[in-house]
UniProtKB/Swiss-Prot annotation:
Substrate binds at residues 105, 137, 168, 247. Homotetramer. Keywords: Cytoplasm, NAD, Oxidoreductase. GO terms for molecular function: L-lactate dehydrogenase activity. It comes from Paranotothenia magellanica. It is found in: Cytoplasm. This is L-lactate dehydrogenase A chain. Belongs to the LDH/MDH superfamily. LDH family.
Amino acid sequence: MSTKEKLISHVMKEEPVGSGNKVTVVGVGMVGMASAISILLKDLCDELAMVDVMEDKLKGEVMDLQHGSLFLKTKIVGDKDYSVTANSKVVVVTAGARQQEGESRLNLVQRNVNIFKFIIPNIVKYSPNCILMVVSNPVDILTYVAWKLSGFPRHRVLGSGTNLDSARFRHLIGEKLHLHPSSCHAWIVGEHGDSSVPVWSGVNVAGVSLQGLNPQMGTEGDGENWMAIHKEVVDGAYEVIKLKGYTSWAIGMSVADLVESIIKNMHKVHPVSTLVQGMHGVKDEVFLSVPCVLGNSGLTDVIHMALKAEEEKQVQKSAETLWGVQKELTL
């Protein structure tokens, strides 16, 4: 008899039981791993699968996390074969070419489209009912690409969008007012990145509109220069990349925040990238961030934001820029 047989007496043969809330992270780069650890530490799933084409890096990251299994309640698996991702509830795609210092997110696009042509069909094959969350940049265009390649209904494909931009915005407003970001309500919509749109008209603390107190807020004529805060949001990622080479922690936490709302069916509102055709005067098939309700079925509702004419114009301009790039893509 083996030690195991001497220690344990078998009562019944276990049937394989699928995990009810399995999450897959595609890509074990900086963002993928920050997302993975954030999801693990928030205890969001029974099983976390990781997949990547870089076999050694993947194996090392999976082993490193598994060595911490004692401190977690999640089964951790990883393989370059997508069968390891089977029956995922949420699949987070972080894989792709990384933004170089000074490179715009839009410049990355065709490089990443080609990578997606391999990834997306594999996800669909093994998790045909999953909710697909795109994080790779340029996120709005790649969410559109994932939607097209997957054939999924629009409510099951979303991009991490401006969830992080809005978090940065709220953090910076909080710094200026000496308040916790959760008490500073503020939204950034539109494109994740350089042409994102700060909705100054909606910025409030405890229901008190800041623009009501300072009508010039967010304009050139504002003596307090609140506009600089949005510039800081846009430049924030570039600044972090310049200083440490990449961004990871905040986007990882942002991803876990979105995964939590889906898995726990929270019906929380997040600014995420979705199909906005027909909203805010957008005519083309583009994905941009607007406030959306997230739950177990995916992206269930969109909140009608009252945008000022100038804000709406900026959203339309973003949409035109993205469509200009999208229509040149070979899918």
